[in-house]
A protein has these predicted regions:
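Cross-family detector of peptidyl-prolyl cis-trans isomerase
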Residues: 1-281
């Protein structure tokens, strides 16, 4: 009987040691192992591959938005529509001219035109309605994003309504949708804290520089309108389209979820209101 008791307690002790070891190993992994950040693979027609590491620790909503759109195929076939040498290259607009915005259908990959969604403020939205995300940078009161916009940094593009009124700063800050830009130099660090940096090129920076050096023309204000040599329009539209053939993101098994959505600012509605008029689309 004594021998049986000794065997029982020996087995119990061994089991306790094993359990404690497993729990200890799990805790050790939790506190010491870093989850891999998402890695973007971007294929650009006639130019090559660019790989980007995303930083959810700096701009979680921007990362959620980019990962979702990319893996839904939103960026496949879009252009780098704006290229400014010694500054940046900008893309991600489905219209290809800088005026487009993603919709809930793009975010949820839905073909159901009757589907309904909600903005963060709980207002109803249709599948075809556009959305924006909150600007995650210091000027907008978001203190966690300390990423500097140096060479290779990827950031969310946004509108600047303050050119129409200084009172529209918040509307400008929260106007990002799908468009992004990649910095090609360290000479514009004044942008740090004013745009949401959310990633960095880790491979293929030479591809970015090759795109930076493409021949550009002035952007036309209307389809078919010729630009003038004396025009004040920015010379930033590539003469030959620079097409992103595919974008995919490896999240290493992490589900980042969908971003919080904001109803886009309606500039025309605001403008009409300045003159006491009602605007109808």
């Amino acid at each position: 009987m004594k021998d049986f008791s000794k065997i029982f307690w020996s087995i119990a002790l061994i089991l306790v040691i094993i359990i404690l070891g497993v729990l200890g190993l799990g805790y050790y992994k939790k506190v010491t192992l870093k989850t891999s950040n998402p890695i973007v693979t971007m294929e650009i027609q006639n130019y090559g591959t660019v790989k980007i590491e995303l930083y959810p620790e700096y701009a979680p909503e921007a990362v959620k938005n980019f990962v979702t759109l990319a893996n839904n195929g939103y960026y496949n076939g879009v252009k780098f529509h704006r290229v400014v040498k010694d500054f940046m290259i900008q893309g991600g607009d489905s219209k290809g001219d800088g005026t487009g915005s993603p919709t809930f259908a793009d975010l949820y990959k839905s073909d159901d035109e009757n589907a309904t969604y909600k903005y963060t403020n709980n207002k109803d939205a249709k599948s075809t309605d556009p959305y924006n995300i909150k600007g995650e940078f210091i000027a907008n009161g978001y203190k966690n994003n300390t990423l500097n916009l140096t060479e290779g940094t990827v950031a969310m593009a946004r509108a600047d309504y303050t050119q129409y009124s200084p009172a529209l700063a918040e509307e400008s800050y929260n106007s990002a949708g799908s468009q992004f830009f990649i910095m090609t130099t360290n000479n514009h660090t004044n942008l740090s804290g004013n745009y949401a940096g959310f990633g960095k090129v880790i491979e293929g920076m030479e591809v970015v520089h090759n795109i930076e050096n493409v021949e550009c023309k002035s952007a036309s204000t209307e389809e078919g309108t010729e630009s003038s040599e004396n025009s004040n329009a920015e010379v930033s539209t590539p003469v030959t389209d620079v097409i992103i053939t595919s974008v995919s993101v490896d999240t290493f098994g992490v589900n980042y979820g969908k971003p919080k959505t904001i109803e886009p600012f309606n500039y025309m509605q605001w403008l009409y209101a300045q003159y006491g008029l009602n605007y109808t689309e």
